Amino acid sequence: IANGFYGLMCANSPATSQWSSFKSTCNYNTWVIGGVFCASMAFLEYDPDYYMTSVANSIRGLEYSVCGFAPSGGWVETPGYGDIAYHYLAHFTSTSEICFGSSFKLPQYQGMDKVSAWRTSMSGYDKTALIGDGSNTGATTDSVMYMDKYYGTDDYRAVRQEYVMSGHVQPELYDVLY
């Protein structure tokens, strides 16, 4: 697998890492660059210099994404797309803290600490307020609960607990972990 990725990861290409998509505030940026970050971490031992360049470029790219959060925690696109962005930023945060002992201050950007409250206000137990072409599925439980714990808030966890206790949703592993 490493041979398939080696030399082909677009975050390392000087031209591609300057491509506008890598400097975007859209959810696509967090999705793709979050994947490049995780793949780089998986293959880091094979060529540390190469893959650390991918890691550095990924972090730089994610700095553009976090600017998509409003001070209130809202997302520049729609609640559904915001959930995608938040989901991958939560995975980045947990992975980077485990691997590097740092989240590189990405969760400290404006509004990030209020996303959970915003997502909770936009979602019921199984649907999200549909705006534009975004999905109307409920919030991604693992990422929202992880970030609730990260910020020391109970915005989503408290509502989620009520949904579980009232029988509206089945408990998940994350209900126990967080």
Language model region names:
Residues I1-S123:
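Aromatic-lined, polymer-binding surfaces characteristic
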Residues Y81-Y178:
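Carbohydrate-active enzyme catalytic cores, enriched for enzymes
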